[in-house]
């Protein structure tokens, strides 16, 4: 919205500052954090009043989790308010990439909200039907993938790029849509599974957002893209502003989510944030790099897949409990040890992922 002020830059030269993505990214970060700080307490109080018993605690989970009973969920609403408000204020609303990323965030967030609602009202960790939820996610993600492919230039827009290789492209054609949808849905559910401990998902999401903020800015800048010999994707630089808002909203939410958490993110937030990051990866043509930068999320979702698959085939469990962060709790790690050590892993993987921009 503030981009509209650029039209007055001839009369007021100071308004030229709104042309700069870096300035607006910083503004989006601060604004999103301020919105969450400002409205967070009221949202928490309202959710606590309406939810009563709060998020149900799994009976087979670590014993230390039972003290969290009564903590409200749906904290993703706080993150939503920060990201949406800040993005509308600081983002370039003429960018198709801005709208498609926000669309996925809202769509996935709505699915997560309904899932949280069912869990709270039924007081069961079993919420929305898994098949129905995945079907809706793939519809939203598939539509987003189609928009992204249509917004670019063929054959590049339907091609898959590879890290460490300058010119290697694999044109997927129409199959780009299901591939991209899989990336977006996978990212959403991977972050969702990671969100099992206070602050565990929040910081890695911010780390991934910061990493892809850099990637989006460089990919959307012809000069930097040429220098680094990465693929230039016009218009994706604007996604840095949205990702700045994600970081700001994450910082604001972490204030309330730090242990002992006053509120949980819930599927409302985790699905939305994962879907958003996945969509940015697709738009910037860094889908494979997402698996590196978001490697912690990949580990979490793979631990669940392996656990379920092996148990169905052999009746035995690979991990004491899945997702894998609960496995380490069962081994005797304290919650803070698991969270901080996983944060460190997320930062290291993000740095490795960013190194692919230069190692070509």
Curated annotation (Swiss-Prot):
Q: Cellular location of this protein?
A: Cell inner membrane
- Family note: Belongs to the glycosyltransferase 4 family. MraY subfamily.
State the Gene Ontology BP annotations.
cell division; cell wall organization; peptidoglycan biosynthetic process; regulation of cell shape
State the UniProt keywords alphabetically.
Cell cycle, Cell division, Cell inner membrane, Cell membrane, Cell shape, Cell wall biogenesis/degradation, Magnesium, Membrane, Metal-binding, Peptidoglycan synthesis, Transferase, Transmembrane, Transmembrane helix
> Could you tell me what this protein does?
Catalyzes the initial step of the lipid cycle reactions in the biosynthesis of the cell wall peptidoglycan: transfers peptidoglycan precursor phospho-MurNAc-pentapeptide from UDP-MurNAc-pentapeptide onto the lipid carrier undecaprenyl phosphate, yielding undecaprenyl-pyrophosphoryl-MurNAc-pentapeptide, known as lipid I.
Membrane-topology descriptor:
Multi-pass membrane protein
Task: Give the E.C. number(s).
Answer: 2.7.8.13
Query: Which CDD domains does this UniProt record tie to the protein?
Result: GT_MraY (cd06852)
Q: Look up the record and name the cofactor or cofactors this protein needs.
A: Mg(2+)
Which spans are transmembrane here? 27-47, 70-90, 93-113, 134-154, 168-188, 205-225, 239-259, 262-282, 288-308, 337-357
Catalysed reactions, as listed in the record: UDP-N-acetyl-alpha-D-muramoyl-L-alanyl-gamma-D-glutamyl-meso-2,6-diaminopimeloyl-D-alanyl-D-alanine + di-trans,octa-cis-undecaprenyl phosphate = di-trans,octa-cis-undecaprenyl diphospho-N-acetyl-alpha-D-muramoyl-L-alanyl-D-glutamyl-meso-2,6-diaminopimeloyl-D-alanyl-D-alanine + UMP
The UniProt entry's GO CC annotations, sorted and at most eight, read: plasma membrane
Q: Which taxonomic lineage is given here? A: Bacteria, Pseudomonadati, Pseudomonadota, Alphaproteobacteria, Hyphomicrobiales
Name of this protein: Phospho-N-acetylmuramoyl-pentapeptide-transferase
Stored InterPro entries: Glycosyl_transferase_4, PNAcMuramoyl-5peptid_Trfase, PNAcMuramoyl-5peptid_Trfase_CS
Disulfide links within the chain? none
* GO MF term list: metal ion binding; phospho-N-acetylmuramoyl-pentapeptide-transferase activity; UDP-N-acetylmuramoyl-L-alanyl-D-glutamyl-meso-2,6-diaminopimelyl-D-alanyl-D-alanine:undecaprenyl-phosphate transferase activity
Q: In which pathway does it act?
A: Cell wall biogenesis; peptidoglycan biosynthesis
Q: What is its main location?
A: membrane
């Amino acid at each position: 919205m503030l981009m509209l002020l650029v039209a007055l830059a001839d009369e007021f030269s100071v308004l030229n500052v709104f042309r700069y993505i870096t300035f607006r990214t910083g503004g989006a970060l601060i604004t999103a954090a301020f919105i969450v700080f400002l409205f967070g307490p009221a949202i928490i109080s309202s959710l606590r009043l309406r939810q009563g018993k709060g998020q149900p605690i799994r009976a087979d989970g670590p014993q230390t989790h039972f003290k969290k009973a009564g903590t409200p969920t749906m904290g993703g609403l706080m993150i939503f308010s920060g990201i949406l408000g800040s993005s509308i204020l600081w983002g370039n609303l003429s960018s198709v990439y801005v709208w498609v990323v926000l669309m996925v965030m809202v769509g996935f967030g709505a699915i997560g909200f309904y899932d949280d609602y069912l869990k709270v009202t039924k007081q069961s960790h079993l919420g929305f039907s898994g098949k129905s939820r995945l079907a809706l996610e793939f519809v939203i993600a598939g539509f987003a993938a189609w928009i992204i492919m249509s917004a670019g230039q063929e054959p590049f827009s339907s091609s898959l790029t590879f890290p460490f290789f300058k010119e290697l492209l694999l044109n997927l054609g129409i199959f780009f849509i299901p591939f991209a949808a899989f990336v977006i849905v996978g990212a959403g559910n991977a972050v969702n599974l990671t969100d099992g401990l206070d602050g565990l998902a929040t910081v890695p999401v911010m780390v991934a957002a910061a990493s892809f903020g850099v990637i989006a800015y460089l990919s959307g800048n012809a000069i930097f893209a040429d220098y680094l010999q990465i693929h230039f994707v016009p218009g994706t630089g604007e996604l840095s502003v949205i990702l700045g808002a994600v970081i700001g909203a994450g910082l604001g939410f972490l204030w309330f989510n730090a242990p002992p958490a006053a509120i949980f993110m819930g599927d409302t937030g985790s699905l939305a944030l994962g879907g958003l990051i996945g969509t940015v990866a697709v738009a910037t043509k860094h889908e494979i790099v997402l698996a590196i930068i978001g490697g912690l999320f990949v580990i979490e979702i793979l631990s669940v897949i392996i656990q379920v698959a092996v148990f169905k085939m052999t009746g035995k469990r690979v991990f004491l409990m899945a997702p894998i962060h609960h496995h380490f709790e069962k081994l005797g790690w304290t919650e803070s040890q698991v969270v901080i050590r996983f944060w460190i892993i997320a930062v290291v993987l993000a740095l490795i992922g960013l190194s692919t921009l230069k190692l070509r």
